[in-house]
């Protein structure tokens, strides 16, 4: 295993994840039961390794430039059921069991509004009380 690649097993063939020039890949989190897309974030090799070791979703924050465990502050965690790679191995999919809302705005999914700004889902928690 190299610093810029993390491998995973699929059908007994190792898949080498193709991290971009910043050392990241997009990671889509999807509810394993409902199929709802919850969020898109970025993953570094370390975040992917930690996710595989712990069974809890870890990501890399581009704004804070640090590794973070989903739910570390809010308690709204993502338990990993399966990790998949796309056909080009440059995007990954976390199939998760979501505890609480996935979005820091209080919604179940980060995709809670249309392009014209209409909110199509209700909040599942109050972010002001969670992120005091």
From Swiss-Prot:
GO molecular function, one term: zinc ion binding
Record keywords: Amino-acid biosynthesis, Cytoplasm, Histidine biosynthesis, Hydrolase, Magnesium, Metal-binding, Zinc
Cofactor: Mg(2+); Zn(2+)
Signal peptide bounds: none
Residues involved in Mg(2+) binding: 86, 88, 90
Cofactor binding: number and manner: Binds 1 Mg(2+) ion per subunit. Binds 1 zinc ion per subunit.
Binding site for Zn(2+): 87, 103, 110
GO aspect biological process, one term: L-histidine biosynthetic process
Cellular compartments annotated: Cytoplasm
Catalytic reactions of this protein: 1-(5-phospho-beta-D-ribosyl)-5'-AMP + H2O = 1-(5-phospho-beta-D-ribosyl)-5-[(5-phospho-beta-D-ribosylamino)methylideneamino]imidazole-4-carboxamide
InterPro entries associated with the record: PRA-CH, PRib_AMP_CycHydrolase_dom, PRib_AMP_CycHydrolase_sf
Any GO CC annotation of this UniProt entry: cytoplasm
Enzyme Commission number(s): 3.5.4.19
Pathway per the UniProt entry: Amino-acid biosynthesis; L-histidine biosynthesis; L-histidine from 5-phospho-alpha-D-ribose 1-diphosphate: step 3/9
Primary residence: cytoplasm
Function: Catalyzes the hydrolysis of the adenine ring of phosphoribosyl-AMP.
Family designation: Belongs to the PRA-CH family.
Subunit: Homodimer.
Official protein name in the record: Phosphoribosyl-AMP cyclohydrolase
Gene coding for it: hisI
